[in-house]
Amino acid sequence: MKKLLPLFAAIPLVLIAAAPLRETQPLTTKQEVELREEICSNFFVPQPLPPVDMKTYRTFVPAPGVKAEAFSYVTQAGMRVPAILYLPDPLPATKIPAFVVVNGHAGDKYSWYSYYTGILFARGGAAVLTYDQIGEGERNINRKSATREHDTIGGGSVIARHLAGLMICDAMQAVSCLCQRPEVDANRIAMGGYSMGSFVVSLTGAVDTRVHACVLCGGGDLDGPGGYWDKSKPMCQGLPYQSLDFLGDRPAVIYALHAARGPTLAFNGLGDTVVAIPTHGEDFFKDMQTRTAELHGSTNGVFDYGFAGTDCGHRPYWLTRPVVEWLQRQIAFSNWTEDKIKAMPQIKISDWTATHPAIFVKSFMKPLTEGGTLALDVNVPGYTHDELNMMTTEQWDHEKTNYILETWLARVQNPE
């Protein structure tokens, strides 16, 4: 067991590796390939992926030491995704790692944690790609955030599988964009998912072998039939997760595919009632590790897990010291060392938002949840919503049909 630095002095944080393996029949490489193909087919993820066709709209400077590009790329059903790429300025002399932010419900590239990640990690010497989830931001018909529009879609399992596939494809195509960037080391790409995003990354990390490391926060606790994830938001989580029943032990298969791909960390607060962590604690994760190792044929590569204390809830923990230290060991931030990370100051996000303009959902900014996040502090400046627009109003009015949920829904319901 490895001890990590505490988020709060009285609360130890731990990260636990897998226990010794019991004898079992592991998946073969051929079976792993077939399972990835079956999962992609189940969610209508195009195989092969389409060309990303990146289109840059503008470049800007969001903070000292950081430059940014606002661009779009192609995803499922010919739709486009608005995105921002944050880069260190100046660029390091050698290629840099990269991190993809996959948002939770109500999240998009405007969300405080997307922006904060962009500035923090870019200053650490990494590229950071953030994007709008379907129905949010510049993928919303009214260009609004925190709408949860995708939850309002009617229909059953087929549309839900299409929706989950869209979210998976969005994330995979973000990786495709990063692989094409000359400044990015394609072997050092990580992906972080928060809340609903943790579900998306759990699936994406199972099927996309280009991703080196995955971080799951506010989730990753995939459970069995009739559990939290089967009963959660039906269109983006519940029905899609139920549709994977053909896998058998869904968590073990998904995480065995992760283990074959690369490192994964699930990190949660023990007080996170949003995704049932109080009943999915250490015993739950240990058992899931054991089952995963049996399918993988080794404890090597099996996911790590860690916890903050019982007064720590639903938060994007990749901004906190223990998870950044884990990421440093996986992708090696170009401007940081582990010693530098250990010495960095921290700031409670509720204090940061009290003194800096930022975009957040007020009901999430509570001490137990996002407001209590103890993020590494590199003097991240505030920002306004429009500073993170990809397009001008005139451009968006002209091009919005390529982005919005209504167009996507029409295309998947009435394919040509």
Show the residue positions of the predicted features.
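Alpha/beta-hydrolase-fold serine-hydrolase catalytic core, especially in secreted/extracellular enzymes
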Residues: 20-69, 74-80, 281, 285-416
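Bacterial Sec-dependent signal peptides at the C-terminal "C-region" and cleavage site
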Residues: 9-25
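Primarily recognizes the serine-hydrolase "nucleophile elbow" in alpha/beta-hydrolase
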Residues: 173-248
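Positively charged n-region of N-terminal signal peptides that target proteins for export
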Residues: 1-4
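The feature captures the conserved acid-bearing segment of alpha/beta-hydrolase catalytic domains
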Residues: 224-289, 293
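Loop/turn elements at helix/coil->beta-strand transitions in domains of secreted/extracellular proteins
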Residues: 95-98, 124-127, 186-188, 209-213, ...
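Glycine-rich His-Gly loop
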Residues: 75-77, 101-106, 269
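Cap/lid segment of the alpha/beta-hydrolase catalytic domain
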Residues: 94-95, 100-169, 226-228
